[in-house]
Amino acid sequence: MSEILLFSPQPLFSYTMNKYSRLYTNSNIRNTFFSEIGIGIAANSLLLLFHIFKFIRGQRSRLTDLPIGLLSLIHLLKLLMIAFIATDIFISWRGWDDIICKFLVYLYRSFRGLSLCTTCMLSVLQAITLSPRSSCLAKFKHKSPHHVSCAILSLSVLYMFISSHLLVSLIATPNLTTNVFMYVSESCSILPMSYLMQSMFSTLLAIRDVFLISLMVLSTCYMVALLCRHRKQTRHLQGTSLSPKASPEKKATHSILMLMSFFVLMSILDSIVSCSRTMFLYDPTSYAIQIFVSHIYATVSPFVFMSNEKHIVNFLRSLCKRVINV
């Protein structure tokens, strides 16, 4: 997905306060965005609490439970960060100093990278779970959550290093008119970087995205192939007239395949919106649309996971009935 909120190392456009100040005067854009963020925060909080209670009760966990719980935590923190940043875009506090700008934007960028990483890891772990005993991946099925935690921790350190340039280039917007700074929010701007630094961080980001997305595509194709083979074997043994009940592993796989497809769709849509911003000379409305599109995945993904959990589905149904009766 394209780097949202101008957090990429390339200077995408110059700082123009008057042009982007129109964002916080448009109540429709502001209300739509904060509604999306509110729904995403509530859904990710519910999914995270479910996995915390599941861990406390000592229930048997699947290999993918830790990444799913971690992904909900990452998306929750990511949405909280963008909510704070969005208040300075749509409401315009203009009271943040360098430390606040660096802290919020750096954390947001780190959570955004971890979201991609954890989604990829989730796809790989589900492929391992679904793999047959004869597969070379079967030996990884019984790995403890500590191995997954170590892998996630290592990637977290890597992403923090890749985003470290923001700690230097992010500043509080000075009270002067200039075309040197790049717009992040009403209070925060990015200093231009040298060509060497731009090239280095762009290369690191490109390598990261290509590697993770390629790994995600390979694991997804592997799961699809396994499901197709299993369906053929089932039809051969039981006949086409019967519809055997899907196992929990198969249901989880379908959910993750749906999530991967949705992730790719949102990535393509995000790229299209990003390109349209270039065509329309970085119109503020296109900028707001890109912010909205780039967070649809974090908002929708918990609903995909919760649809596979009977306890959460039953809880939501009972809650809806109570609301309707009231």
Swiss-Prot record:
This is Vomeronasal type-1 receptor 94. Belongs to the G-protein coupled receptor 1 family. It comes from Rattus norvegicus. It is a multi-pass membrane protein. The lineage of its organism: Eukaryota, Metazoa, Chordata, Craniata, Vertebrata. Putative pheromone receptor implicated in the regulation of social as well as reproductive behavior. The chain crosses the membrane at residues 33-53, 66-86, 111-130, 151-171, 204-224, 255-275, 286-306. Keywords: Cell membrane, Disulfide bond, G-protein coupled receptor, Glycoprotein, Membrane, Pheromone response, Receptor, Transducer, Transmembrane, Transmembrane helix. One of its GO terms (biological process) is response to pheromone. Residues 1-32, 87-110, 172-203, 276-285 are extracellular. Disulfide bonds join C101-C188. GO terms for molecular function: pheromone receptor activity. It is found in: Cell membrane. Residues 54-65, 131-150, 225-254, 307-326 are cytoplasmic. PANTHER family: VOMERONASAL TYPE-1 RECEPTOR.
